[in-house]
UniProtKB/Swiss-Prot annotation:
<dbReference type="GO" id="GO:0016226">
    <property type="term" value="P:iron-sulfur cluster assembly"/>
</dbReference>
<protein>
    <recommendedName>
        <fullName>tRNA-modifying protein YgfZ</fullName>
    </recommendedName>
</protein>
<dbReference type="GO" id="GO:0005542">
    <property type="term" value="F:folic acid binding"/>
</dbReference>
<dbReference type="InterPro" id="IPR023758">
    <property type="entry name" value="tRNA-modifying_YgfZ"/>
</dbReference>
<dbReference type="GO" id="GO:0005737">
    <property type="term" value="C:cytoplasm"/>
</dbReference>
<dbReference type="InterPro" id="IPR045179">
    <property type="entry name" value="YgfZ/GcvT"/>
</dbReference>
<comment type="similarity">
    <text>Belongs to the tRNA-modifying YgfZ family.</text>
</comment>
<dbReference type="InterPro" id="IPR048451">
    <property type="entry name" value="YgfZ_barrel"/>
</dbReference>
<feature type="binding site">
    <location>
        <position position="189"/>
    </location>
    <ligand>
        <name>folate</name>
    </ligand>
</feature>
<keyword id="KW-0290">Folate-binding</keyword>
<dbReference type="InterPro" id="IPR029043">
    <property type="entry name" value="GcvT/YgfZ_C"/>
</dbReference>
<dbReference type="GO" id="GO:0008033">
    <property type="term" value="P:tRNA processing"/>
</dbReference>
<dbReference type="Pfam" id="PF21130">
    <property type="entry name" value="YgfZ_barrel"/>
</dbReference>
<dbReference type="InterPro" id="IPR017703">
    <property type="entry name" value="YgfZ/GcvT_CS"/>
</dbReference>
<dbReference type="GO" id="GO:0009451">
    <property type="term" value="P:RNA modification"/>
</dbReference>
<comment type="function">
    <text>Folate-binding protein involved in regulating the level of ATP-DnaA and in the modification of some tRNAs. It is probably a key factor in regulatory networks that act via tRNA modification, such as initiation of chromosomal replication.</text>
</comment>
<feature type="binding site">
    <location>
        <position position="27"/>
    </location>
    <ligand>
        <name>folate</name>
    </ligand>
</feature>
Amino acid sequence: MAFISFPPRHPSSSARLPLTLIALDDWALSTITGVDSEKYIQGQVTADVSQMTEQQHLLAAHCDAKGKMWSTLRLFRERDGFAWIERRSVLEAQLTELKKYAVFSKVVIAPDDERVLLGVAGFQARAALANVFSVLPNSENQVVRDGASTLLWFEHPAERFLLVTDVATANMLTEKLHGEAELNNSQQWLALDIEAGIPVIDAANSGQFIPQATNLQALGGISFKKGCYTGQEMVARAKFRGANKRALWLLAGKASRVPEAGEDLELQMGENWRRTGAILAATQLDDGQLLVQAVMNNDLEAESVFRVRDDANTLHIVPLPYSLEE
């Protein structure tokens, strides 16, 4: 019996989100197993996975030789290897790149479509899950396991949980929360990631940006002390030579349409508008507000005014829940 996804509804902001169970169809799970798995993944991503405990998950980038990101990966340990979650639109291309050198190592890299990805967020999310699972993650233990389920804890923009589980547990959870929780699709989790300033790399932006252009250093996703990995030289140069002039920004406001990933924005310059930046993700909330995650110059004025191209409405900068000060 397959897991049936949930119909879409406009997402809510974290501040006014009721208890919500979210089907994460736009994200995908993959694994690497085998005796060489840690050594192999360590040589491919920006974070130092050798320092990761069983109770941690972290965001890392998988880059090309020029330091441009194929994708960002939400990594955690699993059995004799690692699992990671990324946007489904980049899955195939990212796995192809990751497997390029696998023939020389004792590893198996594969997508995992057997398991289900769910988000639980909103009002009293912890209390709702405590009725179902015997243990829940928190700031100290960000990853816990309960039977067939792995639960990941997220602090921002408000406490929320990501579940990696089997079909039976997913259906059981849906049934238990029926009537108590709203059901929504990936757009709700996307809205929360945008609010949290977690970079969303879809196919349109794969291979376009170095990690620092999406604030990955501020999210603990880059180690400048670990050994070699693909793209390391360019990532290090951006830090030590100050070569990175871009950052990830959160914008909010109104627009007559929801722009696509890869589109640019327009910045108000006196009476005129100038094209700028690249949109990573955007979504419209249930109150009509548009949230936009974009990579733009890192020296923008806080009161800068933007718009979706040729739109009559405007967008403004919203502070992120973390600092970019090094």
